[in-house]
């Protein structure tokens, strides 16, 4: 086991604070509408330009092990806030730095770190309640667009696009962000259920120009296993031909004789047919086939439940208004399923989302719910260069998360004003002892840090701006850093989601409190590598 370095007390906290400052100073230049960009070097390809706090934080790794520990703890604040709220990472970093700085001073002055932490926790609880009580619920598309615009750094086009997407797919719909091939950013909404599997053979195509298969009012056979022979299916195929409607087969795979027979029948015009592989893998595939069956009013043909292909009738097949099949995607439009069954299935998936502990599973379940209940929208982000597209994509991601958070928990005035005003809730607060009172005071000072930093990044004096904002009693009165004016922030559309502000403060206080109470640090001692031996002389060389 390698030897360890151990640092204690003030020495440990000083090293840690140095790391915190390096990371926080790099992140906080991005805060606010006039925040600057940070350029990140990449081991291959062009450098990446970003204004996203968490992307900057994730890139920072320091040479000194003890400084790095401090930096990584603050990085954790940014990551946690990003995971929960999806935005507010820079605000969380600024708050954490302010709490740790003030806390370190108090500990150096001889105060009890545990009491300081208790005071910080109590004050944060009161501030969170104050934020919740001053929250305004948002409902109109205009307000949703305002939240998106603020988070996208003042780009109205992005805000409006997100509001439009949310309107079309509903609160349970899925909105994804992708890179576009062209210059323009566009919104693409998929109506109906789409999954990422296309036709098994290009011979099923009905539109050779676009290479797609479009089938109107088809029957849908949902089969769990592989189809290699059509013999068991012949009675069913006869019934489908007599009905005069197309047939879509969704199965694990269709190959061999079965595929050849279907293709020949399609080419001769005897049967309008297409075959698609089932989406997903393993248990998730079973669940997705069940979703398709409920959406289309059909049954999954599976030997597990005792249904064999020979005994399948037309009543067991699903139906839809239209199915559109591309090389890599299939879309089912207006499935003929019973609406009560679909609602029941949605409630079942919602219950699974509540219970699951895995982020990956939760994401997949939400996708399934969206396909059944809402819809899927894709925002394709365009730009002139790859660097620009990546930078815009970061901002669209942030804006999307902020908008979702705003719909979920409501909004408060933006620009760091809500946190600064929440400090008034701490005025009459009583603590058990003086050290805890100082903990409350640390939070009160830290609450002004985001407002001061936004003003500083806009070229103003942070202390003067904070003083002027707090002099005015109006809750929505604040500083518009973009225009350099004092105004009613909510009316001007400068708003923050309550969830983002709350999460940023709670995460910052959690890590800040832990760092203040640190008394010792242990890190591996770097090994001194011996210099390489000089190469020996070659034979016949005159040394």
Curated annotation (Swiss-Prot):
The lineage of its organism: Bacteria, Pseudomonadati, Pseudomonadota, Alphaproteobacteria, Acetobacterales. GO terms for cellular component: cytoplasm. GO terms for molecular function: ATP binding; ATP-dependent protein folding chaperone; isomerase activity; unfolded protein binding. It comes from the Bacteria. SUPFAM superfamilies: GroEL apical domain-like (SSF52029), GroEL equatorial domain-like (SSF48592), GroEL-intermediate domain like (SSF54849). Coiled coil: none annotated. Belongs to the chaperonin (HSP60) family. It comes from Gluconobacter oxydans (strain 621H). This is Chaperonin GroEL. Its main location: cytoplasm.
